[in-house]
Curated annotation (Swiss-Prot):
Its main location: cytoplasm. Belongs to the calycin superfamily. Fatty-acid binding protein (FABP) family. Disulfide bonds: none annotated. It comes from Bos taurus (Bovine). The gene is FABP2. GO terms for molecular function: long-chain fatty acid binding. This is Fatty acid-binding protein, intestinal. Tetradecanoate binds at W83, R107. Forms a beta-barrel structure that accommodates the hydrophobic ligand in its interior. The modification N-acetylalanine is found at A2. The keyword Acetylation applies. It is found in: Cytoplasm. Pfam families: Lipocalin (PF00061). The keyword Signal does not apply. FABPs are thought to play a role in the intracellular transport of long-chain fatty acids and their acyl-CoA esters. FABP2 is probably involved in triglyceride-rich lipoprotein synthesis. Binds saturated long-chain fatty acids with a high affinity, but binds with a lower affinity to unsaturated long-chain fatty acids. FABP2 may also help maintain energy homeostasis by functioning as a lipid sensor.
Length: 132
């Protein structure tokens, strides 16, 4: 699968505005913008393993397409939702457990880069990753 491999964040677009909308304080926003996030993604059939490491934490997330699971963001925000494969895109539809608001994420490969697009309350941000 095209998502398999080690991906290191290269740049962000509108990420601070997105985090502000999410309610993340200014200090955490400044730190998160330079978190050196690395994702190691492996896929076996419908099962994905994502090893996420950054300045803040290292975790392993295992999920199956179409199966709801709970997940915590680096700032502690709790989410519940599922990933689906829509064409060549991984589409995540999540809800915050604290307020019920939707947080949607799309991962796609564009020009050899993995583009992760977040949408929350009308604010869209992108994190662009290069394959290592």
């Amino acid at each position: 699968m095209a998502f398999d491999g080690t991906w290191k964040v290269d740049r962000n677009e509108n990420y601070e505005k997105f985090m502000e909308k999410m309610g993340i304080n200014v200090v955490k926003r400044k730190l998160a913008a330079h978190d050196n996030l690395k994702l190691i993604i492996t896929q076996e059939g419908n099962k994905f393993t994502v090893k996420e490491s950054s300045t803040f934490r290292s975790i392993e997330i295992i999920f199956e397409l179409g199966v709801t699971f709970n997940y915590s963001l680096a700032d502690g925000t709790e989410l519940s939702g599922a990933w689906a494969l829509e064409g060549d895109k991984l589409v995540g539809k999540f809800k915050r457990l604290d307020n019920g608001n939707a947080l949607n994420t799309v991962r796609e490969i564009i020009g050899g880069e993995m583009v992760q697009t977040y949408t929350y309350e009308g604010v869209e941000a992108k994190r662009i990753f290069k394959k290592e």
